UniProtKB/Swiss-Prot annotation:
Its main location: cytoplasm. Keywords: Cytoplasm, Flavoprotein, FMN, Isomerase, Isoprene biosynthesis, Magnesium, Metal-binding, NADP. It is an enzyme of class 5 (isomerase). Its cofactor is FMN; NADPH; Mg(2+). This is Isopentenyl-diphosphate delta-isomerase. It catalyses: isopentenyl diphosphate = dimethylallyl diphosphate. Gene3D superfamilies: Aldolase class I (3.20.20.70). Its EC number is 5.3.3.2.
Length: 368
């Protein structure tokens, strides 16, 4: 087995310090316009950003999606993120826990999260390929118990695996059969998330047919994991690097993925993530059809700078979200989900080509 721990460190180093954010790709969120209301009918002070994350109430409709863990220095990053998200009442996901299941010394870098964040929702994380490789109920329960998780994310990352030097692109259909059986035995919900390339309506429908109702888009336009693996390939002189260059804009853009999942699985719980870089992006994702927005890379970068930097980042994000709510007359998150929007440009073209009737979709996104 390759050294997963060193790979985790290299992933964080490349993500934080190389140019991989939105490289050669777009979220399409620029094509979502929130309609300004000159007389909002509310005051800024009465805006309520609280919402539900499964069984728990959260302060803001934003979560930190999983990214890291596995070594002491990564545990320190997780600790900072956990302390700050606890302070702000924001859910936190951890990175893949495979390393902690297979290497006991890696467990503390994940377990620290619950120790410093006793009340917020914490989301465990395992990869779909591990189901093919033999993971089952025992490993899922271990990942959940390790951090006393409120949910577990199962990540899809076929594009990353294809271009990873030591990748394991194993996605046989029986993995979904195993996942369906495991979900029936777990005490917490499963969220299926992508890893920077988005969830299409075909994938959403397939997952739904196996009992999955919770999704995290992780769409194109944010952290480019193909680019991260391309850089790792280049460092190793791996011939895959040249091929990876041709796939840097591969995937379903975040805004399109939100629409595709909401349209095809209207009753889903949906996290809109992938290139969410501001509170305005978060507001657009929610107005477009997500229940909450998710972000990882900007949180990671701020956490590396320190606790104060991350606190300031969240204050900025929350202010921008509330500003968007104020200027659309949305006094709470449910109102934001129903606020008037205009869909333009490439996103409109994408939706129309994919058979999404915009008038019908407007009712679907408002949950009417």
């Amino acid at each position: 087995m390759p050294d997963i721990v060193n790979r985790k460190v290299e992933h964080v180093e490349i993500a934080a310090f190389e140019n991989v954010d939105g490289l050669s790709s777009s979220t399409f969120l620029n094509d979502v316009i929130l309609v300004h209301q000159g007389f909002p009918g509310i005051s800024f002070s009465e805006i309520n950003t609280k919402t539900k994350f499964f069984r728990k109430e959260i302060s803001v409709p934003i979560m930190v999606t999983g990214m890291t863990g596995g070594r002491n220095e990564l545990g320190r990053i997780n600790k900072i993120i956990a302390e700050v998200t606890e302070k702000f009442g924001i859910p936190m996901g951890v990175g893949s826990q495979r390393v902690a299941i297979e290497k006991a010394e890696a467990r503390e870098s994940f377990a620290i999260v619950r120790k410093v964040a006793p009340t917020i929702p914490i989301i465990a994380n395992l990869g779909m390929p591990q189901l093919v490789k033999g993971y089952g109920l025992k490993e899922f329960q271990d990942a959940i118990q390790m951090i006393e998780a409120d949910a577990i994310a199962v990540h899809l990352n076929p594009a990353q695996e294809v271009f990873q030097p030591e990748g394991e692109p194993e996605y046989q259909i029986y993995a979904l059969e195993k996942l369906r059986d495991i979900s029936k035995e777990l005490s917490v919900p499963i969220i299926v998330k992508e890893s920077g390339n988005g969830i299409s309506m075909e994938t959403a429908k397939l997952l739904y047919s196996y009992g999955i109702k919770n999704f995290d888009t992780s769409g194109q336009g944010g952290t480019n994991w193909i680019a991260i693996e391309m850089i790792r390939d280049i460092r190793r002189g791996n011939w895959k690097a040249e091929s990876a260059k041709n796939f840097l804009n591969w995937g379903v853009p975040t805004a399109a993925s939100i629409m595709e999942v909401r349209y095809s699985v209207p009753d889903s719980f949906l996290v809109g993530s992938g290139g969410i870089r501001s509170g305005l992006d978060a507001a657009k994702a929610i107005a477009l059809g997500a229940d909450i927005a998710g972000m990882a890379l900007p949180v990671l970068k701020s956490a590396i700078e320190g606790k104060e930097s991350l606190e300031q980042f969240f204050r900025k994000i929350i202010f921008e979200l509330k500003a968007a709510m104020m200027l659309t007359g949305s006094k709470d998150v449910n109102a934001l989900k129903k606020t008037s929007i205009v869909i333009l440009g490439k996103l409109k073209e994408w939706a129309e080509y994919r058979g999404i009737n915009l008038s019908t979709y407007d009712k679907v996104r408002k949950r009417e």
